[in-house]
Amino acid sequence: MKTLLLTLVVVTIVCLDLGYTRRCFNHPSSQPQTNKSCPPGENSCYNKQWRDHRGTIIERGCGCPTVKPGIKLTCCQSEDCNN
């Protein structure tokens, strides 16, 4: 009985992937690639692009923010998908 219970606990942990956090790129357009672990419950990454006097600006991070008109936003839900 103990073996069965232990097996069920292990299977549950493996299937639920407890403690898993999404990883997203967070480097600005002109910087080397970096990524970070998102807060628990944050399951998406974003890539936000716009143009100003410096050229095309790219911002990356966790979540899927609301943006103003004229800003291109791409949201995705896999590891490091926002490059």
From Swiss-Prot:
Give the signal peptide, or none: 1-21
Q: Which GO terms describe its cellular component?
A: extracellular region
Under the heading Gene3D superfamilies, the entry gives: CD59
Q: One Pfam match, by short name? A: Toxin_cobra-type
Which tissues is this protein detected in according to the database?
A: Expressed by the venom gland.
Q: Where does it localize?
A: Secreted
The UniProt family comment states: Belongs to the three-finger toxin family. Short-chain subfamily. Type I alpha-neurotoxin sub-subfamily.
Q: What does this protein's UniProt record list under function?
A: Binds to muscle nicotinic acetylcholine receptor (nAChR) and inhibit acetylcholine from binding to the receptor, thereby impairing neuromuscular transmission.
Protein name per Swiss-Prot or TrEMBL? Short neurotoxin OKI-17/NCA-06
Give the organism, scientific name.
Answer: Laticauda laticaudata
